From Swiss-Prot:
Cofactor binding note from Swiss-Prot or TrEMBL: Binds 1 divalent metal cation per subunit.
Protein family membership: Belongs to the SurE nucleotidase family.
Species per Swiss-Prot/TrEMBL record: Campylobacter curvus (strain 525.92)
Cofactor requirement: a divalent metal cation
Disulfide bridge partners, by residue number: none
Keywords: Cytoplasm, Hydrolase, Metal-binding, Nucleotide-binding
Binding-site positions, a divalent metal cation: 9-10, 42, 95
Presence of keyword Disulfide bond: no
Functional summary from the UniProt entry: Nucleotidase that shows phosphatase activity on nucleoside 5'-monophosphates.
The name this protein goes by in its record: 5'-nucleotidase SurE
Length: 256
């Protein structure tokens, strides 16, 4: 029996989380445990909660929410407080929205997969891209189809995940009948907004909202972003080695 721990950054009630769990339970000889944040934690990246205690709240058998925790908290505490033996796989998702290019650095979904990798466990992040679609309109049927294709191959070693790397999977905003297949691609480059929108409440107090600007991407390169826009699922191996190795020698020369 293979043990899979799943979490997300949309919260324990999110439809994508429950669709993921249902899809995984259709894979033979798999046991699924859910540990998810008690509320939405989008864009919390790979943060841990170090300034207050955390507690598990049992929802059902093998289903817990972690009170006011981040996705990385969920993975860390589940591994050290719930499991006596490490699970075979950590899966984060299915996120309500894509995690493409530099989104990965902000993503709580990807942060949870990073934590799994740091704990020595194979990890995958699944995210559903939306263009002009709503969650209700597009649903998760294609995403679940992709989960059931990829996960057994990871568990069986057909898809190799080296140490300190996780697999980032983004699902295109198309119906299953229009799905074009799978493409392995590098993470692209997002073009982020360079302005902030000022608002005022009825009393005239100023405030700002983050994340409400449309994002573009650098064209002319094959990337996870272009692949998704073409109707393919993107598969991107993400490594945790953040050293810019190509710059090491030049930097050393500056200090000789």
């Amino acid at each position: 029996m293979k043990e899979i721990l799943i979490t997300n950054d949309d919260g324990f009630e999110a439809k994508g989380l429950h669709e993921l769990a249902d899809a995984l339970r259709q894979i033979p000889d798999v046991n699924v445990t859910i540990v998810a944040p008690s509320s939405e934690k989008s864009a919390c990246a790979h943060s841990l909660t170090l300034t207050k205690p955390l507690r598990f709240i049992k929802i059902d058998d093998n289903f817990f929410k972690l009170d006011d925790a981040t996705p990385s908290d969920c993975v860390y505490l589940a591994l050290h407080a719930l499991y006596q033996k490490k699970p075979d796989l950590v899966i984060s998702g299915i996120n309500h929205g894509a995690n493409l290019g530099e989104d990965i650095t902000y993503s709580g979904t990807c942060g949870a997969a990073m934590e799994g990798v740091l704990q020595g466990i194979k990890s995958i992040a699944f995210s559903q891209f939306y263009k002009n679609n709503s969650i209700e309109e597009l649903g998760f049927s294609l995403a679940c189809q992709i989960v059931k294709f990829i996960v057994p191959r990871v568990l069986e070693g057909e898809i190799c995940l080296p140490q300190r790397q996780f697999l980032n999977v983004n699902i295109p905003a198309v119906a299953a009948r229009d799905f074009k297949g799978y493409k392995v691609a590098p993470a692209g480059r997002r073009c982020y907004a360079t302005h902030a929108t000022l608002n005022r409440n009825p009393r005239g107090v100023e405030y700002y909202w983050l994340g409400n600007a449309a994002l573009d991407y650098e064209e002319g390169q094959i990337s996870d972003i272009s692949v998704i826009n073409d109707g393919f699922a993107s598969l991107t191996p993400i490594q945790l080695d953040m050293t810019a190795h190509a710059s090491l020698e030049n930097l050393k020369k500056s200090f000789q």
